[in-house]
Amino acid sequence: MSLPVSPSIFTVSRLNQTVRQLLEMEMGQIWLSAEISNFSQPSSGHWYFTLKDDRAQVRCAMFRNTNRRTTFRPQNGQQVLVRASITLYEPRGDYQLIAESMQPAGDGLLQQQFDQLKQRLSAEGLFDQQFKQPLPSPAKRVGVITSASGAALHDVLQVLQRRDPSLPIIIYPTSVQGAEAPLQIVRAIETANRRDECDVLIVGRGGGSLEDLWSFNDERVARAIFASRIPIVSAVGHETDVTIADFVADLRAPTPSAAAELVSRNQLELLRQLQSQQQRMEMAMDYYLAQRQQQFTRINHRLQQQHPHLRLARQQTLLFKLQRRLEDGMQNQLRLSSRRSERAQQRLAQMQPQARIHRYQQRVQQQEYRLQQALERQLNAWRQRFGVACSQLEAVSPLATLARGYSVTQTPRGELLKTTKQAQVGELLKTRLQDGWVESEVKTITLAKKPRKKRAAE
């Protein structure tokens, strides 16, 4: 049975052609928000992928000459905004989209803007290490730029109160989220630099989404941080959150609490250091006294082994010098200890640990008194031992024998004259008396008569 030819009867190819023309003329170009899936890039360089939402999907192509202008590479699961034309592929009767442009949507767009700004500022040198300022150690006053009602400020204040309650804090309240937040943060940084009230700044906020933290990815904030004369610690969000402010700041802290730890001193650690220094000082003083005592013992031993008065006098002079140096050294050590104690008291006074200072001061005074008493006892003992040594030397000295009326005579040859056989008439003899020397000439030599021994009775 043959069918009549009528204009209302289409062939398949004509139908597909008509539908394609209708779609292209009626729809034109549209903007589509969707998720990418089934992304592929064959050797031709064209992109083929599917755009979908939770209820439908459509095929899409983006030709090589067009996708070259795209600033990112699409990934499966990424949300995008696509400007495309609707067409129909006539051989299969499938309609599809031909993409003309594509950009990330939502967080994807923000991430693209983040990467572009990061690359540009890095090229300008704003992230270079040579521009990083060192943090003051210790900080004398800390400035905090954050929301006055946020959890970040509460965390910072709590940490500073625990670690260093005497550290002054200046708060520069500002918005940290919203369209006005970047400008307010910039003004707070400029105000802190103009007033010059603190020597380190903490700039940050608590955690949140990428959009919540976006104020700290603003170029104006980055340049204000870079221009700050006061060192800045960035403390934005949690440890996994990274912002442009973190790259520009002089130091990045993973959280606001960690930033407070970095800029503050540990009061307990200072007390431990003071105790350690006191122990080292006491050990040094004990070592110094032991060395001086050993030195005195060696000198005293040498004096006991040497008999002549001249050497004894030299050793006595040296002993006096050493005694003076010992006394001066101890006085210097005591003065140095006193100055260290005064400096420690001043530092502790600023932190108001009055009770511990009073106890340590009493201990230092007790140690000083004990040291002086020990030194005086030791010096008195040394003086007594020295006097005994001098008395012993005087007792065995030849000069003591001469003082009792005896004399010593020498021949011209330097021999001690003991018998008449050593002397000759006309020789000059030299006689040592208590108070000097006498020279005499031998006139005659007379032998002393030996006493006769009585014969034994027969």
From Swiss-Prot:
It is an enzyme of class 3 (hydrolase). One of its GO terms (biological process) is DNA catabolic process. Keywords: Cytoplasm, Exonuclease, Hydrolase, Nuclease. The keyword Cytoplasm applies. The keyword Glycoprotein does not apply. It catalyses: Exonucleolytic cleavage in either 5'- to 3'- or 3'- to 5'-direction to yield nucleoside 5'-phosphates. Pfam families: Exonuc_VII_L, tRNA_anti_2. This is Exodeoxyribonuclease 7 large subunit. It comes from Serratia proteamaculans (strain 568).
